[in-house]
Amino acid sequence: MIADIDIASIITALQSGASWGYRMVFVEMILILPLFFVQDAAGRLGTVGGWGLGEAIYRFYGKWIAIMAALPMAISDFLEYVAEYAGIAIGLYLLGLPIILGLAAVFIVHTAIVLGRRYRKAELLLLPISFLLVVSIAASTLIFHLDIRTIIMIGLSPIQPYGNASFDYLIAANTGAVIMPWMLYFHSGADSRKKLKAADLKMERLETLIGAVISEVLMSIIVLDGMHIKEINGLIDAGQISAALSVFGGYASIVMGIGFIAAGFLALVVVSLGSAWGIMDALNRRSRNSFIKIYLLESAPALLLVILVNNYVSLMITLMVIYTIIIIPSLFFLGRLTSNQECMNGKPLKRYETAIFWVMSLSIVVAGITGIALIV
């Protein structure tokens, strides 16, 4: 859950609140639908079919199609590494630490975790800190004077300023912030490796639904918190982000900085696992050397890019918009595979479920195309 609400998601929600306030709440809540139905399909592929998405593409579409599908997977992983390193850079900035040296240290430690396969220990250490960051932001929101009537009448109203370039751009960014390509591979791969069966599907779907609702409620709370952050030239200032934790007074920057670094590091760990279950499965590679090569080819250039830029907020929001386009091949294969009798062991998605999946996927793509058009 926390891996899905990562630093880039938090930044996107804070920016949405700073720019549009209550009006972005409706967008966050409506995103429960595509988030649930897309992740539910990934969960079914792993639970009923027993396949990770990358593995299933290789098995049912062959080597060359799988190789082509691996490219957007790799781009997605690279972009996620960029987003997390950018978030960690903001954390270092808030703590007053040297950004380049700090990022280099994070890269070295993360590489050591990858090489030593100490994922579980890292998760146990970082998850509580990351969770506290989200809880702290939520707690800060409660101390502000929120107009409940405005939340209901404007925040939850389906009538919003669609067509406004800034609003539509942030719709695309929020879509990409919660429906991330690598999560499809992580979700399906995790369920298949846990050896879940069709009998476990009801509980698996319930967990996915609860996760989608909690994720978007948290995003909505963060949006409300973002209303109290000042913008500079249409973007929130990294130095002002700690205003989201005003409940901590003079310690806000320290708490936010530590939280950002921990949340970013946790996401790096999860992404490296998702990469193994996506690209390596699609390429039908299982060797340790292949995994290390893929990790270095994705993460090292991402680190370099973040070192070379300085507007981390703009970078992360742009990446969230790009996600909605990069995810297209993954959505296509996921929809086809979950409709395949053989792949799903005779229990594919029903026709109406398939129709809902494609409608939700189309909504993601339309949001992305709109966002990309606004960038160009």
Report each predicted region and the residues it spans.
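Transmembrane helix-boundary motif of multi-pass solute transporters/channels
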Residues: 1-31, 41, 236-238
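Flexible loop linkers connecting adjacent transmembrane helices
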Residues: 12-15, 40-65, 231-246, 342-348
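Transmembrane helix-loop boundary segments of multi-pass membrane transporters
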Residues: 14-15, 19, 54-58, 86-100, ...
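Selective recognition of specific alpha-helical transmembrane segments in multi-pass small-molecule
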Residues: 26-34, 38, 203-229
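Juxtamembrane transmembrane-helix boundary signature
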Residues: 27-60, 68-79, 226
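Transmembrane alpha-helical segments of multi-pass small-molecule transport proteins
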Residues: 68-71, 94-115, 132-136, 287-304, ...
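Membrane-interface loop-to-helix entry segments
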Residues: 105-106, 114-144, 320-327, 359
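Hydrophobic alpha-helical segments and their helix-loop junctions in multi-pass secondary transporters
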Residues: 131-159, 168-188, 333-342, 367-376
